[in-house]
């Protein structure tokens, strides 16, 4: 049971990355357009704001498509089914909810009693994915043959969405009310506590690749803002981009991604044995620059996550504290993908106290460096370059690595599902015992996570290319 649950959660996490991948361009368009820069013509700002806003306004539908594709090996029919399911589900609720609640449609809309948001998109995507996997090979009588196979999937998904819409009309109002109450508490009443908890748990979920699921309600659901054009935005990211002065609570990520973790990487480099210092320095400096520029932290985190768990626990606590610090000091900046220098500069149009970030960030860097340096030495932690024995990595070009990677996962017969997100290969296997974890690390994996039948190997931003090469190798071998 646990094996299947973790494997499915892995797929959910991966499927959510597709909708998230559109945030950078949408965020830049909306953020820059809403900032009304004096050097940008008004018509250009308006076009950019409307273009970016259209993406955020359709995020539930985009999430529906992403979830459907994530569970069906990117089959386009499931995406069509998700669109059909979402549209039908929403319209069904619009008709049934007033009858169930005995309230006018206007009041239901004002109280968001039938507004499922991105969660409704995820539900619709799950319906489409289930129906696709269940019916894509269905055979019908000859006179209905045109509707057999994959053509049947959007039809049955739409019918299932009607039933789902009716059920949600009964069960969603109390759920929606609870979500709305949490949203108000987190966004307006006690954001210091809410985002402190968010930051700590988010880092705790990184080892399992499940942090994308935890991010969704905070990034895309909490809070509400209506701009001058009447567009309504939910979630901290869309609200900030649209110009909401109360948004930007996710700014704490800049402190530990741009300053804290790069300092930790330098501490690991300085703590390596003299004979390994040059090699470790190259790896750590590269990882530090990646974190500073793009906010991608896994190459650093997985270098100490398993060999020195105490360091990761402290890191998670410091990451959690970064968010309340920024909120209490009134520091606000925008993020679309992750908290790196690119986001920091490009999305600064609606920011507050931007000058404080490098000052507080320098303090965070000192704390990280000191804690890591002292504990590594005092506890003799086996961080990179301090191991008793070292193996040279055999990593090469992605096309050259594919056969070795397939072999390390136990061979193509052992691989039941192959996927990748931004920084890790996500592989489901028939027999975990056949997976060569040491071999994966020799090939360049920063870490390997095994839970149930799911295996994650962290190869950084080249993971998706590795997945493509492995797919091609498996098909042609």
Curated annotation (Swiss-Prot):
It comes from the Bacteria. One of its GO terms (molecular function) is protein-N(PI)-phosphohistidine-sugar phosphotransferase activity. It catalyses: N(pros)-phospho-L-histidyl-[protein] + D-glucose(out) = D-glucose 6-phosphate(in) + L-histidyl-[protein]. Residues 399-477 form the PTS EIIB type-1 domain. Residues 1-388 form the PTS EIIC type-1 domain. InterPro entries: Glu_permease_IIB, PTrfase_EIIB_Cys, PTS_EIIC, PTS_EIIC_1, PTS_Glucose_EIICBA, PTS_IIB_1, PTS_IIBC_glc, PTS_maltose/Glc_sub_IIC. One of its GO terms (biological process) is phosphoenolpyruvate-dependent sugar phosphotransferase system. GO terms for cellular component: plasma membrane. The modification Phosphocysteine is found at residue 421. Keywords: Cell inner membrane, Cell membrane, Kinase, Membrane, Phosphoprotein, Phosphotransferase system, Sugar transport, Transferase, Transmembrane, Transmembrane helix, Transport. Its EC number is 2.7.1.199. The active site is at 421 (phosphocysteine intermediate). Residues 36-50, 101-111, 173-190, 270-279, 331-355 are periplasmic. It is a multi-pass membrane protein. It holds the Pfam family PTS_EIIB. The chain crosses the membrane at residues 15-35, 51-71, 80-100, 112-132, 152-172, 191-211, 249-269, 280-300, 310-330, 356-376. Residues 1-14, 72-79, 133-151, 212-248, 301-309, 377-477 are cytoplasmic. This is PTS system glucose-specific EIICB component. It comes from Salmonella typhimurium (strain LT2 / SGSC1412 / ATCC 700720). The lineage of its organism: Bacteria, Pseudomonadati, Pseudomonadota, Gammaproteobacteria, Enterobacterales.
């Amino acid at each position: 049971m646990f094996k299947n649950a973790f494997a499915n959660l892995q797929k959910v996490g991966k499927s959510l990355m597709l909708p998230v991948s559109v945030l950078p361009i949408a965020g830049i368009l909306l953020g820059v357009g809403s900032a009304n820069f004096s050097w940008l013509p008004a018509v250009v700002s308006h076009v950019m704001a409307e273009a970016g806003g259209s993406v955020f306004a359709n995020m539930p539908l985009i999430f529906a498509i992403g979830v459907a594709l994530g569970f069906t090996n990117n089959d386009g029919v499931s995406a069509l089914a998700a669109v059909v399911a979402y549209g039908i589900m929403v319209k069904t609720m619009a008709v049934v909810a007033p009858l169930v609640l005995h309230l006018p449609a206007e009041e239901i809309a004002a109280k968001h009693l039938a507004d499922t948001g991105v969660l409704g998109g995820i539900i619709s995507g799950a319906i489409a994915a289930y129906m696709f996997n269940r019916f894509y090979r269905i055979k019908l009588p000859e006179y209905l043959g045109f509707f057999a196979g994959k053509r049947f999937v959007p039809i049955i998904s739409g019918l299932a969405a009607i039933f789902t819409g009716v059920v949600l009309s009964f069960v969603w109002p109390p759920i929606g009310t609870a979500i709305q109450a949490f949203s108000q508490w987190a966004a307006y009443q006690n954001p210091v506590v809410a985002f402190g908890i968010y930051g700590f748990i988010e880092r705790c979920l990184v080892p399992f690749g499940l942090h994308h699921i935890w991010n969704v309600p905070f990034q895309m659901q909490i809070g509400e803002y209506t701009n001058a054009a009447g567009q309504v935005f939910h979630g901290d990211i869309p609200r900030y981009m649209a110009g909401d002065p109360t948004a930007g609570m996710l700014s704490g990520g800049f402190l530990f991604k741009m300053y804290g973790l790069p300092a930790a990487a330098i501490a690991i480099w300085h703590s390596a044995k003299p004979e390994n210092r040059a090699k470790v320095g190259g790896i750590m400096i590269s990882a530090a620059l990646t974190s500073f520029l793009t906010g991608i932290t896994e190459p650093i985190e997985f270098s100490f996550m398993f060999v020195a768990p105490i360091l990761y626990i402290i890191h998670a606590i410091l990451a959690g504290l970064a968010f309340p610090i920024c909120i209490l000091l009134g520091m606000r900046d925008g993020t679309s993908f992750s908290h790196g220098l690119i986001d920091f500069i490009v999305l600064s149009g609606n920011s507050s106290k931007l000058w404080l970030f490098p000052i507080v960030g320098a303090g965070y860097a000192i704390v990280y460096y000191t804690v890591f340096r002292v504990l590594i030495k005092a506890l003799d932690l086996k961080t990179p370059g301090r191991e008793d024995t070292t193996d040279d990595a055999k990593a090469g070009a992605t096309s050259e690595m594919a056969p070795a990677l397939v072999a390390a996962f136990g061979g193509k017969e052992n691989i039941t599902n192959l996927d990748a997100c931004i920084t890790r290969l996500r592989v489901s296997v028939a027999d975990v015992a056949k997976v060569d974890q040491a071999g994966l690390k020799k090939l360049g994996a920063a870490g390997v996570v095994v839970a149930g039948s799911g295996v994650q190997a962290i190869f950084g931003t080249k993971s998706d290319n590795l997945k493509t090469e492995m797919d091609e190798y498996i098909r042609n071998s």
